[in-house]
């Protein structure tokens, strides 16, 4: 018998779609229409749900990074609005999916009021639903904790591609939900990783002692 993580406890099976919906509710646009540095830590503990090919997979956000529009050289929007970065300028509550190093697709969620640039990179998830499907998508993962412990890993796990770029995550097939009964946890704020500029900015957040983060 394999033990999988469930919201708030352990179980020998992962959440069904019905259980997931009954325990959570959709985030509205007002949640995202706030400063990026407020949205990034507040996304911890929220649930990303993706429905594709008749399958539902989901994971709890355990690690995020904030990227600002002004004065943040690591942000894609640092040089202004372009065809590839226009989604970052709003409206809030949409997905920004891009290809990194020509190999890995990364999922970001847009924050700030419409017209202002800001997004949150989702760095790691704790798998909650559709785990068998996730395992098929991540056959090289040797441990449950490695299924979605990184930006490129989690998009593979969720089945999210650049086809979801610009998707409204307050409705549709790719959504972000919150627990009806929120759990409590401590949050660690530290510097971002995997970038070459603006590395000293403390814009990375993760759930303390959560084993699914990419790097404590």
Question: Which residues make up each language-model segment?
Answer:
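Conserved, well-structured core segments that form or line functional sites
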Residues: 8-216
């Amino acid at each position: 018998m394999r033990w999988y993580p469930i919201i708030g406890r352990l179980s020998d099976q992962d959440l069904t779609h019905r259980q997931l919906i009954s325990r959570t509710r959709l985030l509205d646009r007002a949640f995202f229409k706030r400063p990026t540095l407020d949205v990034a830590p507040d996304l911890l503990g929220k649930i990303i749900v993706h429905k594709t090919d008749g399958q539902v997979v989901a994971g709890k956000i355990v690690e995020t990074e904030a990227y600002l529009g002004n004065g943040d050289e690591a942000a894609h929007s640092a040089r202004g609005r372009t065809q590839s970065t226009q989604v970052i300028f709003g409206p809030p509550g949409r997905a920004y999916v891009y290809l990194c190093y020509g190999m890995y697709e990364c999922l970001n969620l847009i924050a700030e009021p419409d017209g202002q640039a800001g997004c949150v990179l989702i760095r790691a998830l704790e798998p909650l639903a559709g785990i068998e499907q996730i395992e098929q998508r991540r056959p090289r993962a040797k441990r449950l904790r490695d299924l979605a412990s990184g930006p490129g890993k989690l998009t593979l796990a969720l089945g999210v591609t650049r086809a979801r770029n610009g998707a409204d995550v307050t409705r549709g097939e790719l959504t972000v939900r919150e627990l009806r009964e929120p759990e409590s946890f401590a949050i660690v704020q530290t510097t971002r990783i995997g970038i070459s500029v603006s590395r000293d900015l403390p814009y990375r957040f993760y759930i303390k002692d959560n084993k699914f983060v990419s790097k404590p």
